[in-house]
From Swiss-Prot:
It comes from Nostoc sp. (strain PCC 7120 / SAG 25.82 / UTEX 2576). Catalyzes amidations at positions B, D, E, and G on adenosylcobyrinic A,C-diamide. NH(2) groups are provided by glutamine, and one molecule of ATP is hydrogenolyzed for each amidation. Residues 252-443 form the GATase cobBQ-type domain. Keywords: Cobalamin biosynthesis, Glutamine amidotransferase. NCBIfam families: cobQ (TIGR00313), PRK00784.1 (NF001989). This is Cobyric acid synthase. SUPFAM superfamilies: Class I glutamine amidotransferase-like (SSF52317), P-loop containing nucleoside triphosphate hydrolases (SSF52540).
């Protein structure tokens, strides 16, 4: 296909493909290119809703913002959202098309998936100067290569000069590079135009003998040695939550997020982590809840299964007791549903059909349906401060109904749309369907100020920018750092 492109693959998962791809998008955008990110197939529970209501991986949305363009579904034509029991929801060009187990996925979706990839690339070619493609995992998985929709099949289709990224932080980098190249077909290996050594810590001169050997051994230049930057870049995989730092020396507030097994859109909490006076801690449902300033139940792809786990581990009771003692609890999306009175799944969308009792902290009843809601929203807040503009997006299959209350003032709509969330009269129990809630700077600060007041702390200014401005600065910083250590000359026409 005649389209200018760069492919980024990695020797392993977590090599840093997303970071490098994102940085290249911003670097080339700053040089005047009209760039589109692309990932043929992504498996992730962090999703974003485009303007036309389609779902893509959140990482591709970040890459689009890095490129200075609006996210499109064509930038991630296949999104797989794991649901447990070795099954995933399959989303093609933004729309859910089915649920399938791993064994049957390629049998049912390989051909339509590749057509969606081809059509998406052809569409992007009409609108952009260059596409930056990101692979997944490793391009040299022998048992998967014949049905790989994401790595070298895309590179060959585009005849794309390809970067091979390796993580040196965990050790074994040289073996990973040589082994990967040995396992590629000659046609694939010919496309590898440079190696990037990522996550390097230490003195560069100590690495030079290894680089010299690698270049002589493979005949491929090392075009970049990138310092360790992962701490300033949002993680895509929930496993990375285990490695996040939870301690801040000067944190005034401690917020605990329950790390549900199928936690989704934990990017919702990046803005909280960016607050200098807030420490965010992720705990498993089996850990002690402790006494934080607030507890958050995040989104989840398997609401009922995670609700049952919370009940089995005692975390559900711990949260109920915490709320009864005056603690602040917030549920987002699936977490909001869990805080309600009941969740019903009559069609067995999430697994076994049935009705399940929630934590009964909010007066809502939820029914899981086959029709997913995915849309961007612009609303106005009622709490914690009246009239604040709030932007975000919904992604959920449940329909929640607010139950009538004897005391009409006991619970109030959180926004000017009652269907988007509730808060109790004490402003202790909150629930919302809105992802990206904390991205809204004034709303985030107003919510945090309520927690600060409970601690007797001075309120912080609420006239702050939305998180997207911090994200833009982060993307600029990452791009500048990568550009200082990466030679893109062999990859540009």
């Amino acid at each position: 296909m005649a389209m200018k492109s760069i492919m980024v693959v990695g020797t392993t998962s977590h090599a840093g493909k997303s970071l490098i791809s994102t940085a290249i998008c911003r670097i080339l955008s700053r040089r005047g290119w009209r760039v589109a990110p692309f990932k043929g197939q992504n498996m992730a529970l962090n999703a974003y809703v485009t303007a036309n209501g389609g779902e893509i991986g959140y990482a591709q949305a970040v890459q689009a913002w890095a490129a200075g363009v609006v996210p499109w579904v064509e930038m991630n034509p296949i999104l797989l959202k794991p649901q447990g029991d070795m099954t995933s929801q399959v989303i093609i060009r933004g729309r859910p098309v089915g649920r399938v187990n791993a064994a049957d996925y390629y049998e049912q979706y390989f051909e339509p998936g590749w057509r969606a990839i081809e059509e998406s690339l052809q569409h992007l070619a009409t609108e952009f100067d260059l596409v930056v493609c990101e692979g997944a995992g490793s391009p040299a998985e022998i048992n998967l290569k014949h049905r790989d929709l994401t790595n070298m099949r895309v590179a060959k289709y585009l005849n794309a000069p390809t970067l091979l990224v390796v993580d040196i932080d965990r050790g074994g980098a040289f073996a990973h590079v040589v082994g990967t190249l040995e396992l590629l077909d000659p046609e694939e290996r010919q496309l590898i135009k440079g190696v990037v050594i990522n996550k390097f810590r230490g003195q560069r001169s100590l690495l030079d003998p290894g680089i010299k050997w690698l270049e002589e051994r493979t005949g491929i230049p090392v075009v970049g040695v990138i310092p360790y930057l992962q701490e300033v870049f949002p993680a895509e995989d929930s496993l990375d939550l285990l490695e996040r730092k939870t301690h801040k020396a000067h944190a005034d507030l401690q917020i605990t997020v329950v790390r549900l097994p199928r936690i989704a859109n934990f990017t919702d909490f990046d803005p909280l982590e960016s607050e200098p006076t807030v420490a965010v801690k992720y705990i498993s449902p089996k850990q002690d809840l402790g006494h934080p300033d607030a507890v958050i139940l995040p989104g989840t792809k398997t609401t009922i299964a995670d609700l049952i786990l919370l009940q089995k581990t005692g975390m559900a009771e711990a949260i109920q007791n915490y709320a009864a003692s005056g603690g602040t609890v917030l549920g987002i999306c699936g977490g909001y549903q869990i805080l309600g009175q009941m969740i019903a799944d009559p069609e067995g969308i999430e697994g076994q059909a049935g009705r399940y009792q929630g934590l009964n902290l909010l007066p809502i009843r939820t029914v899981i349906t086959g029709q997913k809601i995915a849309r961007q929203r612009q609303v106005s807040s009622n709490f914690p401060q009246q009239g604040l503009p709030v932007n975000g997006f919904e992604i959920h299959q449940g329909r929640s109904r607010v139950e009538p209350q004897g005391d009409s003032q006991a619970f109030q709509p959180l926004f000017d749309d009652v269907n988007l969330g509730l808060v109790d009269s004490c402003q202790s129990v909150w629930g919302s369907y809105l992802h990206g809630l904390f991205d809204n700077g004034p709303w985030r600060r107003a919510w945090l100020n309520r927690l600060r007041q409970q601690r007797g702390l001075k309120s912080l200014p609420t006239g702050v920018a939305n998180y997207r401005e911090q994200r833009e600065q982060m993307l600029d910083n990452i791009a500048t750092e990568v550009e200082n250590h990466l030679d893109l000359t062999p990859f540009l026409p």
